[in-house]
Amino acid sequence: MRDRILPFAVSFAATCLFFINVCDWIFDCGCRSLWAGADAMCNVHLANVHHCPICSRGIAGYTAVMAAVSAPQLAASVWLPFDKVTRIVLCLLLFPIGMIAVGGLLGLYDGYWGFVGERVGPR
């Protein structure tokens, strides 16, 4: 069983470390690495601007996004019939793919990029 969980453990560690970096890459919101200020410069702390769709949802939102991004990694780690190294690579690739999918949906829902029309989500 340890062999099945190891790819998830590696990808989950990478997800936890670089989650906020990918948030900034998607939304250009001002978030920085955990060791360089994290969300201290995120636009969620500024008035009268579009707020980062991930950071604006608080701890519950972070938890939901992390669960949505990590669930496919866990499934791939446990159920795919490939060798351990291949599953590690696939699980690591699922991190940015999951963040783009979840972040994209939240950004569209919130009207973050402004090309969908009126904001329909929470401000």
Q: What are these language model-derived features?
A:
Residues 24-61:
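Extracytosolic (periplasmic/ER-lumenal) interhelical loops and adjacent juxtamembrane/interface segments
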Residues 1-5, 67-97:
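Cytoplasmic juxtamembrane regions at transmembrane-helix boundaries
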Residues 23, 73-77, 103-110:
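Membrane-water interface at transmembrane helix exits
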Residues 7-27, 94-104:
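Hydrophobic alpha-helical membrane-insertion segments
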Residues 53-58, 85, 112-119:
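Membrane-helix interface and helix-disruption motif detector
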